Amino acid sequence: MTFYISSSLTPTHFSKPLNPSNTLFPSQFRGSLSSFVRRRKPTEAKLSSKFNLFPSRRNGLITCCSTSSFESTESSVSQEEDAESNRLFEKLRETERERLSNMEELERKANVQLERQLVMASDWSRTLLTMRGKLKGTEWDPETSHRINFSDFMKLLDSNSVQYMEYSNYGQTISVILPYYKDGEPLGEEEDSKKEIIFRRHIVDRMPIDGWNDVWKKLHQQIVNVEVFNVDVVPAEVYTTVATFVVWSMRLALFVSLYVWIDSITRPIYAKLIPCDLGTPTKKIRQPLKRQALGSLGKSRAKFISAEEKTGVTFDDFAGQEYIKRELQEIVRILKNDEEFQNKGIYCPKGVLLHGPPGTGKTLLAKAIAGEAGLPFFAANGTDFVEMFVGVAASRVKDLFASSRSYAPSIIFIDEIDAIGSKRGGPDIGGGGAEREQGLLQILTEMDGFKVTTSQVLVIGATNRLDILDPALLRKGRFDKIIRVGLPSKDGRLAILKVHARNKFFRSEDEKEELLQEVAENTEDFTGAELQNVLNEAGILTARKDLDYIGREELLEALKRQKGTFETGQEDSTEVPEELKLRLAYREAAVAVLACYLPDQYRPISETDINSIRSQPNMRYSETSGRVFARKSDYVNSIIRACAPRVVEEEMFGIENLCWISAKSTLEASQRAEFLILQTGMTAFGKAYYRNQRDLVPNLVPKLEALRDEYMRFAVEKCSSILQEYQSALEEITDVLLEKGEIKADEIWNIYNTAPRIPQKPVRPVDEYGALIYAGRWGIHGVSLPGRVTFSPGNIGFATFGAPRPMETQIISDDTWKLVDEIWDKKVEEIKAEAVIQIEEEKKKPQILMATHFF
């Protein structure tokens, strides 16, 4: 083995690698090294000393001694030199081995990098050629052809006819690429080189789940060469160099520059075409999360409650309407195949619909069923089904019913079902309305469709709007029972209060019973939720006052808070100017006088003040229990009372000095008159019900205005007459308000009963038929002169005398009638005078006597 030594002993200076078979080991090298040392010259010694080959003797000198001493010295030196040389060459051998392994690793990585670059270049070239259509019909870009069965694919594998395969969707879909002649004939056993060959892709249809095992067994028998690249390991093994970094940086810079240039050109164009699409981009989620989100759109969002779970709510928590509890408990027993109903041919209803005002306990009943039925329970909301994507509502409904049938017998509860069960063909038919209707149709199909299912699933729906639900959803066979959960009665309210008063502290049971009885009497038309809130508010007030028990004062205060009429008296007072204070005093005094003259038995007055500046009167009323059954006189009296602020301000300050504090009084009076005419059916306008003026045909609008003006005329005149009659009471109440700032109901009644009265002329009553007759006539001549009777289209019986245009109307006032009478009388007098003149002229003319006169 020949090797060269340079100025320093490093592995990189060997021109040829060491060969272990030709290397001199210490046992073979010992003798030659000793003789070499003995025979070397001083120059060689200097050379060896320079290169540190023999460090143990580099400072020593070779001297001549006696034979015995020289031999012993030579023997010891030879042993030291042999040991040192062994260490030296062992170090050289390890260093050379490390260098060779590093070179082999570098060469392997370079080959891997080159191979990856070649593969990438071939892939890019193949992709570009495919995009340009150069590889159309080859094995890289085959033509799409018909599907083949899995059995045919296995026959191809058995005959070793499969050369190319593709798989996608994680191996769930496989395709086989087969060669064909261009004229469409398949290749035979002997290939014709003159004909052109094309490749076609055939997707394998209906592949079994475990079909890959058979496919791989067949393919492994035909594999000739397999090349596997671990895409996660190979890039990590390739060393990044400066050149690679520079090249990829240039590529990235070129790509970014190209993107910015294209964006700068196209953005103004898109800004003009689609200006709404260029907003701030939203944060994008990762692709797997996107796929997961899109895949979960069709899944049901209903909350599942197993048979063993408890909701914390039982039927004991629902009080007031015991018959509803009995109905639902009986339905649950039928659903669970109770022995009482098994042999009687009774089937469980498919659906139960709970409807009623908000807060009456519909959702509470569903929670109680979920807690006590002992059956799987699915709770959903009507808004959970509809999304912005088409088909999501139907898919979620289908998934909900499929899940419930897998747990049958089970219960589905859909709260606010009107969100998806509204009538079809409404104003929201486009867009989201069509998607909602698809969900509704799926519910109809699942509840009672063509497909018959034996799984017992009970659907419970809850809604506040039964009137807007689709009739197909309400028919028997879908919702077999429709139960109204209405407002509780007095006994029901007492039972509800007892349920919610379990954890409340009262002084004694007798006092508790008495207070709850009083609250139940004063809370007519209260729902269960409102009663619960009353007791909770009373508990808050008790804690605020640092009391141990709930008392009557706290309950009444909580009741006022619930009704929205509670005032603490600690509100900030506003500075009221003297002139405005006088106006407020007259306004409140007028309202008080009218309330005493025309009392409202359902709203007795309580007190009033002038401490707050509002457009509405400050009069406060006492609430009475019971329902209000208003008569026509009550409506008319309310119209008169509403006119009091405007009338008193006009009489006291003049029509030129009106201000905003009485602005809403005439508006309120006009609205009440319109309500009386349109919605009560108590007037000559007719018994038909109209929600507002927009429901009227054009011919009836003038009649409504005429009748409303007639009621407003009567209300203003009557209110003015009452205030003039009780002028002294009005002034006295005003003085009390200016002095004290407030006045109670007892003092108001005392002043009203003791004040002197000034009699007034009776007010002309309301003439409903006269107002309707005058309304709609056309012009003076049409009224005064006789003519033909014509009927307005769409309004049978509406007659106008000589009216050429019945659609146009004009109201004739009393002054106009007086003017018509004057014109008529004047015209008659003129005609009479002309007749008298003509007669006198006739008398003055000479008479011609005929001959016959003498005979």
Curated annotation (Swiss-Prot):
InterPro entries according to UniProt: AAA+_ATPase, AAA_lid_3, ATPase_AAA_core, ATPase_AAA_CS, P-loop_NTPase, Peptidase_M41-like
Transit peptide start and end: 1-78
Cellular compartment(s): Plastid, Chloroplast thylakoid membrane
Cross-referenced Pfam families: AAA, AAA_lid_3
Top-level taxonomic group: Eukaryota
S-S bonds: none
Annotated ATP binding sites: G356, P357, P358, G359, T360, G361, K362, T363
SMART domains: AAA (SM00382)
GO biological process: embryo development ending in seed dormancy; protein import into chloroplast stroma; proteolysis
Membrane-traversing stretches: 242-262
GO MF annotations in UniProt: ATP binding; ATP hydrolysis activity; ATP-dependent peptidase activity; chloroplast protein-transporting ATPase activity; metalloendopeptidase activity
Self-association and partners: Homooligomer. Interacts with FtsHi2.
Similarity-based family: Belongs to the AAA ATPase family.
Annotated function: Functions in chloroplast biogenesis and chloroplast division. Required for plastid development during embryogenesis. Might be involved in chaperone functions or play a structural role in the thylakoid FtsH complex.
PANTHER family: INACTIVE ATP-DEPENDENT ZINC METALLOPROTEASE FTSHI 4, CHLOROPLASTIC-RELATED (PTHR23076:SF99), METALLOPROTEASE M41 FTSH (PTHR23076)
Protein name according to UniProt: Probable inactive ATP-dependent zinc metalloprotease FTSHI 4, chloroplastic
Organism from which the protein derives: Arabidopsis thaliana (Mouse-ear cress)
